[in-house]
Amino acid sequence: MKVRPSVKKVCPKCKVIRRKGVLRVICENPRHKQRQG
């Protein structure tokens, strides 16, 4: 899980979702998981 000021899709399978007011990127590649901090 990377914590970043700006989250972006890394690959076509990444999805940007909002969970409890926090932007997250979920992907089948665990290295692409991100959260806005």
UniProtKB/Swiss-Prot annotation:
One of its GO terms (cellular component) is cytoplasm. One of its GO terms (biological process) is translation. It comes from the Bacteria. InterPro entries: Ribosomal_bL36, Ribosomal_bL36_sp. GO terms for molecular function: structural constituent of ribosome. Pfam families: Ribosomal_L36. Keywords: Ribonucleoprotein, Ribosomal protein. Belongs to the bacterial ribosomal protein bL36 family. This is Large ribosomal subunit protein bL36. It comes from Oleidesulfovibrio alaskensis (strain ATCC BAA-1058 / DSM 17464 / G20) (Desulfovibrio alaskensis). The lineage of its organism: Bacteria, Pseudomonadati, Thermodesulfobacteriota, Desulfovibrionia, Desulfovibrionales. The gene is rpmJ.
